[in-house]
């Protein structure tokens, strides 16, 4: 089996963490006997410095003609003062739009070795393992009309039936590979758009009777994620609610350096850590590569349909952490922090 991956390391620590992920991919090649073709392209500030644009046509075309895209991180102080349309964040929005990515997946998994790194008590977070499916292209961020004047501001929250259907199906399919439970988050007691959301999710559920479906209002969900995160398996929700809840979920794990993500469409998918480019530690071999390596696990699960390899990567991360290796962001007081390279090698050693 051959896989074609476009690697876009981006800026700051992106190059270092993607290098770690590529090293893991090379070890997986040896272990499983497949071939990975990796084509690297510039993106973000790194692309702007060379080509005068954050996202070139060549990079975009490569992303459209591969099996999956692996992104490191984009942005930094160097490019902050550019016009909005030339900023790295605008390029990220463009690539998501051009690839038709409509669902953002954010896992929240607490590794046993890191329960004390969470801001919550160990007995609350131990065993937490859920994923948030956030609709990415609809809702209040994109609804029209929108605007403001000196006296008022207005936005429109709109969802089309098909937008809800397609992300609901993704969530139900994922639940079948997990614990078989979906929690749909809305505000149907107040918002008509949430009433549509709930009706459509329940209609789709008719095709997935083997999966348990529950509903929860978003305000209660925010409380429950902090109070008892272990109760969740798959969360599916709209753009605004998902934006907020996925950040709340993320902090349960103890470090942004641990959190992978996936943005998925009907034909394409992009995988990336949720952390930024961290220019303050870039080039120092200090960054935590785990989120990027875990993003590769998501790639195998969702794009390549190899849940066995995805679980292998996740177990290797857990086993490496169990040996006591820690990068600076997850090191406890008195621990000796290891480098990006050393953490990568510790994970690879568990994959042999």
UniProtKB/Swiss-Prot annotation:
GO terms under cellular component: cytosol
An MF annotation (GO) of this entry: 3-isopropylmalate dehydrogenase activity
Pfam families listed in its UniProt record: Iso_dh
UniProt-listed Enzyme Commission number(s): 1.1.1.85
Key words of the record: Amino-acid biosynthesis, Branched-chain amino acid biosynthesis, Cytoplasm, Leucine biosynthesis, Magnesium, Manganese, Metal-binding, NAD, Oxidoreductase
Subcellular location: Cytoplasm
Keyword Amino-acid biosynthesis: yes
Enzyme kind, highest EC tier: oxidoreductase
GO annotation, biological process: L-leucine biosynthetic process
Cofactor note text: Binds 1 Mg(2+) or Mn(2+) ion per subunit.
Sites where the protein binds substrate: 96, 106, 134, 219
Pathway(s) annotated for this protein in UniProt: Amino-acid biosynthesis; L-leucine biosynthesis; L-leucine from 3-methyl-2-oxobutanoate: step 3/4
Cofactor(s), by name: Mg(2+); Mn(2+)
Reaction(s) catalysed (UniProt annotation): (2R,3S)-3-isopropylmalate + NAD(+) = 4-methyl-2-oxopentanoate + CO2 + NADH
InterPro entries in the record: IsoCit/isopropylmalate_DH_CS, IsoPropMal-DH-like_dom, Isopropylmalate_DH
Binding, Mg(2+): 219, 243, 247
Predominant cellular place of this UniProt entry's protein: cytoplasm
PROSITE patterns listed in its UniProt record: IDH_IMDH
Binding sites annotated in the UniProt record for NAD(+): 76-89, 276-288
Site-annotated residues for Important for catalysis: 141, 187
HAMAP family in the record: LeuB_type1 (MF_01033)
Family of the protein in this entry: Belongs to the isocitrate and isopropylmalate dehydrogenases family. LeuB type 1 subfamily.
Assembly information from the UniProt record: Homodimer.
Function: Catalyzes the oxidation of 3-carboxy-2-hydroxy-4-methylpentanoate (3-isopropylmalate) to 3-carboxy-4-methyl-2-oxopentanoate. The product decarboxylates to 4-methyl-2 oxopentanoate.
The protein, known as: 3-isopropylmalate dehydrogenase
Provenance organism: Chlorobium chlorochromatii (strain CaD3)
């Amino acid at each position: 089996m051959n896989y074609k991956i476009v690697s876009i390391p981006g800026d700051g620590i992106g190059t270092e963490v993607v290098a770690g992920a590529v090293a893991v991919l090379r070890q997986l090649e040896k272990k499983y006997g497949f071939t990975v073709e990796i084509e690297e392209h510039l993106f973000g500030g790194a692309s702007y410095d060379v080509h005068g644009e954050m996202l070139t046509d060549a990079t975009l075309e490569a992303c459209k003609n591969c099996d999956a895209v692996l992104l490191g991180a984009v942005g930094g102080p160097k490019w902050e003062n550019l016009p909005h349309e030339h900023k790295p964040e605008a390029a990220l929005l463009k690539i998501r739009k051009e690839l038709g990515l409509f669902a953002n997946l954010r896992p929240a998994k607490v590794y046993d070795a890191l329960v004390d790194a969470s801001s919550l008590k160990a007995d609350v977070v131990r065993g937490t393992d859920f994923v948030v499916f956030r609709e990415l292209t609809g809702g209040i961020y994109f609804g029209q009309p929108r605007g403001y004047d000196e006296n008022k501001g207005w936005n429109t929250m709109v969802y089309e039936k098909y937008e809800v259907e397609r992300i609901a199906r993704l969530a139900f399919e994922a639940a079948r590979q997990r614990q078989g439970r979906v929690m749909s988050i809305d505000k149907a007691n107040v918002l008509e758009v949430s009433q549509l959301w709930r009706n459509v999710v329940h209609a789709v559920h008719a095709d997935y009777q083997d999966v348990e479906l529950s509903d929860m209002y978003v305000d209660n969900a925010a409380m429950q994620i902090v109070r008892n995160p272990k109760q969740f398996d798959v969360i599916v929700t709209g753009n605004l609610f998902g934006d907020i809840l996925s950040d709340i979920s993320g902090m349960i794990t103890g470090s942004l350096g641990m959190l992978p993500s996936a943005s998925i469409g009907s034909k394409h998918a992009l995988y990336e850590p949720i952390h930024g480019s961290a220019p303050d530690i870039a080039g120092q071999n200090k960054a935590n590569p785990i989120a990027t390596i875990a993003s590769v696990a998501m790639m195998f699960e969702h794009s390549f349909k190899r849940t066995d390899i995805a679980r292998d990567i996740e177990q290797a991360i857990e086993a490496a952490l169990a040996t006591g290796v820690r990068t600076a962001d997850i090191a406890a007081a008195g621990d000796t922090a290891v480098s990006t390279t050393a953490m990568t090698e510790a994970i690879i050693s568990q994959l042999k």
